[in-house]
């Protein structure tokens, strides 16, 4: 199947999942995870109607920006971001989804202040409490919100999570539901620089379960572009 056909099929599945959950399909965004896909593939996905593109690596982001690969859609950064590469991302993307530490939060705020902008971000939550993954612990999110007013050049737009890898349908629903309840808890309070209207969770293998649990953005790569060939990955 072509990229356009894959996008159409994912949209169909998203609609089915949304309607089954009593939700409006238009309230859920499709973010194309473009890691290891070239500028032409990205352009095809945008032409097929994805809502935004998500890039995992600073090197790829920089190269594709130079090629105008993202024209026609917002670009987000969705991979682990090192503090020494913040300058290459802040102001270049509409949303940084993967803010996983207070140190990174502060670095983004400083760079945004230097540029005279407000950078939109999501806080990444290590919802499965996995030692191999970065992210804030769920119990640290609400206390962190009390300090967000100190960072005047960032705006928290919501939360992002990558649950543990599972090959069993529905197994990650408990993590998705925990994320949803955490986002509700934040919305019920009033914090400076916080507008929690985005809940980014769900990928190629589990986006239907994420939608059933309240996701407002799914990040899909393999189901759009096909399996990645890591043997040919020269950027590792």
Regions found by a protein language model. Give the residues of each.
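Conserved alpha/beta-domain cores
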Residues: 1-205, 213, 225
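Expand to "…catalyze enediolate/carbanion chemistry for C-C bond making/breaking, isomerization
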Residues: 208-212, 220, 224-231
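Mg2+-dependent phosphoryl-transfer enzymes with acidic/Ser/Thr/Gly-rich catalytic loops
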Residues: 233-236
């Amino acid at each position: 199947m072509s990229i356009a056909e894959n996008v159409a099929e994912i949209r169909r599945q998203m609609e089915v999942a949304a309607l089954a959950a009593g939700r409006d399909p238009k309230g859920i965004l499709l973010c194309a995870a473009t890691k290891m896909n070239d500028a032409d593939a990205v352009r095809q996905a945008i032409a097929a109607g994805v809502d935004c593109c998500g890039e995992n690596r600073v090197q790829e982001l920089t190269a594709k920006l130079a090629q105008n690969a993202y024209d026609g859609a917002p670009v987000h950064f969705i991979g682990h971001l090192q503090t020494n590469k913040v300058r290459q991302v802040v102001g270049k993307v509409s949303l940084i989804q993967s803010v996983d530490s207070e140190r990174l939060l502060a670095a983004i705020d400083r760079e945004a202040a230097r540029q005279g902008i407000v950078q939109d971000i999501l806080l990444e939550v290590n919802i499965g409490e996995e030692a191999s993954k970065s992210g804030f612990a769920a119990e640290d999110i609400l206390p962190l919100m009390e300090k967000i007013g100190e960072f005047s050049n960032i705006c928290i737009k919501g939360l992002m999570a990558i649950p543990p890898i599972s090959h069993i349908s529905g197994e990650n629903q408990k993590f998705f539901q925990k994320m949803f309840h955490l986002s509700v808890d934040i919305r019920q309070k009033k914090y400076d620089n916080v507008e929690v209207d985005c809940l980014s969770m769900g990928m190629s293998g589990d986006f239907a379960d994420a939608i059933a649990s309240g996701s407002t953005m799914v990040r899909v790569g393999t189901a759009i572009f096909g399996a990645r060939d890591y043997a040919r990955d020269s950027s590792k």
